[in-house]
């Protein structure tokens, strides 16, 4: 299955007419590199680098923000930045080229612009009653303003970025992001991946 998926992604990325609509296809980069190492297939690594160069050209200037990582937002979002961040960092780890590290830092900075670094006073309700702390959680996009635990998914990469750049602040924040998500692990009840920390709600038309 992995070979078929990577063959598809590599063929798609090699097409001169390939011009993805959003940053979402950057999620192909890291798996392509993993497959390149697993199968010894340089074609996968070349496809990953081509895709990453494409997204760097589109987004490093921020003339076009990272976007398209979520299913339900029509503008820029954290997940789009994470797609590029994980891809750029994977290429740095694959090549040790400092330019990929610089690009990873840029995408990580955008991811972190969505990170809450304080405890928001929550509206009355169950989460406030349980003393939920929002430090280390992330907002989704300017359109979807709730918080989610999505940051835990890139906390390991953020920690590694801190290691590569000798930035203890990044490592410390990554630990906070990773540990914070455990607050909603409970044997009773359930809670979706998002919480509403404001009195604002989107009602639709």
Positions of PLM-derived features:
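Glycan-recognition and catalytic cores of secretory/periplasmic carbohydrate-active enzymes
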Residues: 1-205
């Amino acid at each position: 299955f992995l070979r078929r998926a990577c063959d598809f992604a590599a063929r798609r990325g090699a097409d001169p007419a390939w011009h993805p609509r959003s940053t979402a296809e950057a999620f192909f980069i890291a798996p392509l590199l993993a497959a390149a190492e697993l199968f010894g297939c340089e074609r996968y690594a070349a496809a990953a680098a081509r895709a990453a160069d494409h997204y760097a050209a589109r987004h490093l200037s921020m003339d076009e923000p990272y976007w398209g990582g979520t299913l339900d937002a029509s503008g820029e979002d954290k997940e789009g930045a994470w797609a590029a961040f994980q891809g750029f960092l994977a290429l740095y780890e694959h090549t040790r080229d400092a330019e990929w590290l610089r690009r990873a830092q840029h995408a990580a900075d955008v991811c972190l612009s969505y990170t809450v670094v304080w405890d928001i006073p929550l509206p009355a309700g169950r989460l406030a009653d349980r003393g939920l702390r929002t430090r280390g959680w992330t907002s989704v996009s300017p359109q979807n303003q709730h918080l989610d635990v999505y940051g835990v998914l890139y906390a390991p990469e953020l920690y590694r970025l801190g290691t590569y750049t000798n930035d203890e602040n990044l490592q410390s924040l990554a630990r906070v992001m990773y540990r914070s998500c455990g607050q909603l692990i409970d044997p009773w009840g359930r809670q979706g991946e998002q919480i509403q920390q404001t009195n604002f709600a989107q009602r639709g038309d």
